[in-house]
A protein has these predicted regions:
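Conserved SAM/SAH-binding loop
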Residues: 111
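Aromatic pocket-lining residues of Rossmann-like dinucleotide-binding sites
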Residues: 118
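Class I SAM-dependent transferase core
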Residues: 7, 11-103, 121
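Class I SAM-dependent methyltransferase core
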Residues: 106
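Conserved SAM-binding motif I beta-strand of class I
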Residues: 124-129
Length: 131
């Protein structure tokens, strides 16, 4: 999965209804900092990946809340803190430069949000979901 870098070009941070996500994304990042996320690479990745596109459009206004949201099929997208913490923990075992992971296999990827975040740090991400 080659997601890194394409999101900001393809999905400008404004919805079709004109709602802007910039302020709420900034608030999400500040909240993650306040909750103890320290790796700025992780915070940068979360600020670049547009979480709202992984949700039904009816939930876009809640996309950057620090909570799990339903994605259908009795599943949820993980709250941003959990995504940040898992990614930060994974990166704590790697170097600090460039693409630090070669291959990542994510089992139970749901809508792909965590996979998109991981694509900022891995050469290849393979995501598997049972749906």
């Amino acid at each position: 999965m080659r997601c890194a870098g394409i999101f900001t070009e393809r999905f400008l941070i404004v919805s079709s209804s004109g709602f802007t996500f910039t302020r709420v994304k900034d608030q999400m990042i500040q909240q993650l900092l306040d909750m103890g996320i320290k790796d700025f690479r992780v915070l940068d990745a979360l600020s670049q990946v547009p979480r709202h596109i992984f949700l039904d459009q009816a939930l876009w206004s809640r996309a950057y809340e620090n909570r799990a949201l339903t994605i259908g099929y009795k599943q949820t997208i993980s709250q941003p803190y959990i995504v940040a913490r898992m990614t930060e923990h994974l990166l704590s075992h790697t170097s600090k430069r460039g693409k630090v992971l070669n291959h990542v296999l994510e089992i139970g990827s749901g809508c792909g949000y965590q996979s998109a975040v991981l694509s900022y740090f891995a050469n290849d991400v393979c995501a598997v979901e049972r749906i």
